[in-house]
UniProtKB/Swiss-Prot annotation:
Region (Disordered): 1-61
Gene it is expressed from: CYCA2-1
Keywords associated with the record: Cell cycle, Cell division, Cyclin
Functional description taken from the UniProt entry: May negatively regulate endocycles and act as a regulator of ploidy levels in endoreduplication.
Protein name: Cyclin-A2-1
Biased composition (Basic residues): 1-10
Amino acid sequence: MHRASSKHTNAKKEAISTSKIRDNNVRVTRSRAKALGVSNSPSKPAFKHETKRVARPSNKRMASDNITVCNQKRRAVLKDVTNTLAESIISTEGNVKACKRGGKETKQIEEDGLVDVDGEKSKLAEDLSKIRMVESLDASASKQKLVDCAEEDRSDVTDCVQIVDIDSGVQDPQFCSLYAASIYDSINVAELEQRPSTSYMVQVQRDIDPTMRGILIDWLVEVSEEYKLVSDTLYLTVNLIDRFMSHNYIEKQKLQLLGITCMLIASKYEEISAPRLEEFCFITDNTYTRLEVLSMEIKVLNSLHFRLSVPTTKTFLRRFIRAAQASDKVPLIEMEYLANYFAELTLTEYTFLRFLPSLIAASAVFLARWTLDQSNHPWNQTLQHYTRYETSALKNTVLAMEELQLNTSGSTLIAIHTKYNQQKFKRVATLTSPERVNTLFSR
């Protein structure tokens, strides 16, 4: 009972002390309350911090003061420096009036860097009037120019309509119809860069003459027929021979070795299944050994810097024949054979080196169309567009080619004539025109 009464007394004291502390606005924790409750001495009130209340001004006065301070600290907003001059010119009059309203005297300052407004305005007005006058003159001149061009270019527009697109609708991916125009742009440049010399017989060679060169190529035509090589191989062979002899002296005894070596290289490049080296040695009746051919092959390739991808007459002839047949209702196979025949006739002639391969190909198509049909002009807008040659540019080449066509009977170089006199080529070597082609250029 004594313990219960003591506990009751302590709880009562603790409650009283806690209430006193709350009255004194002191934060009480449990430990502090317990400590105060255990001690029998009366608890001292905690020190109360007295905070002086600062007198606040009225809201109205504060707002007016803020406005005054803001007006004192307010500055002009930064602007784009490049607009300063223009804005100063435009707002000069307004600023002068505003200054007068403020009661301040202003004076006009004429210093360096300031613009005379009246002078600038008059100058701008003069410039604007000049510009408008020039624009009106240009507009009238352009209208007159359009009228003149429309009258002068009616024939050109008609010609453009007559050009047949030979690349559209081609399904064979090997024709590269999407890139054909760009490809032949590059080929036209390449034929100028990789062209053999036209005077190497005089400047470089001493034992070789044009006749010996013609005999070698005529024999290589027979070799290509013996091994059934494509015509691209024959054209590349002749190109390699001429390019090598343009910079290297060759003895007469090594001329045939050079011929079979160049055909071996061309066969490796163009043929699917090229003849073996031993076959080329055999075709010369074993005049040259295998080691001699290999040695010459290395010499030729090093001299040409291994540049074997060159445009030949056959490269252009393939495309020009397609352009010639595009305007025909029924393409004539005889025209293709005849153009190939004329082009191959030029291989044996040293004098044709002065003509570009593209020019020889275009002339072959021209002469072939004339030989088969004298009722129509052999050249049209489509051929002129794709060959890039006008009729006048073909004159010398066509006339020289016609001489080869008419004088084959008296020539000793008959391999090409014999080749195209076969039935598989429609015997086009026997075809001639009743009217000479020079009549076309004299009209």
